[in-house]
Design a protein with these regions (language model features):
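N-terminal accessory segment detector
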Residues: 1-102, 108-124, 134-135, 139-178
Length: 178
């Protein structure tokens, strides 16, 4: 603490851009970066995927309990995926949906600028979306066609709801019920 005779500001009054959200996003960014540097992108994505699956299970259970249902319909899955991202400051929206796929766009990553250069962090979206879709609809394959992490201005995420020629040709991860 500065005394009255000095002009040095008090530490607690310094304009340091640090609060819990920034700290946690930075922590996740650095953990993902360290994993990418130490074990490589593919392995880092695998580690983040495990976390994403657990988080997806928890979020899925919370929405089903709040809605009072045992299983979400296809339209409810789309609504839940958009809503969960909204709640964590993402800006996902449905571009289109049919019996084979739900296609999402996104204008803002919940990790903000901390995701840039850390594509392994996108496995959170892949796994949370994949787990929720598969647990409720039986199957999902998530293809991250464009991501902010890799420099795109927004994300394009396709959640395939059944195996098709198109889904089998698309890069991505498959998820199954159970």
């Amino acid at each position: 603490m500065a005394d009255a005779s000095t002009s040095q500001p008090r530490v607690e009054d310094l304009p340091i851009p640090l609060e819990r959200d920034v700290f946690l996003r930075t922590l996740i960014r650095e953990l993902a970066g360290t994993l990418q540097d130490v074990v490589g992108l593919e392995e880092a994505s695998g580690f983040v995927s495990v976390v994403g699956q657990r988080v997806g299970d928890q979020i899925n259970a919370a929405y089903k309990a709040a809605l009072g249902v045992e299983s979400l319909s296809k339209s409810e899955v789309a609504d839940v995926l958009v809503d969960l991202k909204r709640r964590i400051q993402g800006d996902f929206y449905v571009l289109s949906q049919d019996d084979e796929a739900i296609i999402f766009g996104n204008r803002a990553c919940p990790f903000g600028e901390k995701v840039i250069g850390r594509p392994s962090m996108c496995m959170m979206t892949s796994n949370v979306f994949g787990v929720i879709a598969a647990e409720n609809l039986g199957y999902a394959k998530v293809s991250l066609e464009a991501t902010i992490a890799e420099g795109a201005p927004g994300c394009r995420v396709v959640v395939y709801l059944k195996p098709t020629t198109e889904s089998e040709a698309a890069p991505g991860r498959e998820y199954f019920q159970g």
